[in-house]
Amino acid sequence: MQFDIITLFPDFFTSPLQSGLLAKALERDIARVNLVNLRDFAHDKHRRVDDEPYGGGVGMLLKPEPIFEAIESLEILPPREIVLMTPQGEPLHQALLKTWAGSYQQLILICGHYEGVDERVCEHLVTREVSLGDFVLTCGEIPALAIINGVTRLLPGTVGKAESLKLESFEAGLLDYPQYTRPPVFRGWQVPPVLRSGNHQDIADWRYQQQLDRTKERRPDIWQKWLEEQD
């Protein structure tokens, strides 16, 4: 998987890409990350990539020329997706991460800034707009990093035990069940006895019921969708 990141702040990614599973995946060439400094495609001495919006308004917009030129400079590795990080995009979800990991060779991630980007970028270049949720961040680098992390961990060879990916939240349409480790009693709080019983069927039944209860309580939207899929 090739990730090309169009950003004003390449250094933002330095530490996360050198840590944990992401670093190992890059070392093994499971994934590749190419950081593209948008200012390298500015054409004035100040390396300016933003300007005032037509019609007035607060703040600045990223200009179309540097973004188009930055992406046109990249090697094309189809199938690819050109993604803009924006609060106006569709919410990022696990199914989308799985689609990217399983069906795409290249993700080009445009990190938004200021008040956004010239709409012509969205209309004629971007293939998908994505948001982390109903809130606003100072930059698009944070959601871009979330996508890199979320997709890479789904690529074969990244996670040691592939089976663990099948048992986590959202894979069965439900949230994950609660988990415990040693000690069996901590400050008077006890691990549920069923988990120490050794009865695998009882444990499986308990975990499934916990998934149902937790999803219904915490994420009624997911719960309703799950119910509809059972019909």
Curated annotation (Swiss-Prot):
Lineage: Bacteria, Bacillati, Cyanobacteriota, Cyanophyceae, Oscillatoriophycideae
Enzyme Commission number, as recorded: 2.1.1.228
TM region(s), chain numbering: none
Catalytically driven reaction(s): guanosine(37) in tRNA + S-adenosyl-L-methionine = N(1)-methylguanosine(37) in tRNA + S-adenosyl-L-homocysteine + H(+)
Main localization category: cytoplasm
Entries under PANTHER family matching the protein: TRNA (GUANINE-N(1)-)-METHYLTRANSFERASE (PTHR46417:SF1)
Protein name, as recorded: tRNA (guanine-N(1)-)-methyltransferase
Protein origin, superkingdom: Bacteria
Species whose genome carries this gene: Microcystis aeruginosa (strain NIES-843 / IAM M-2473)
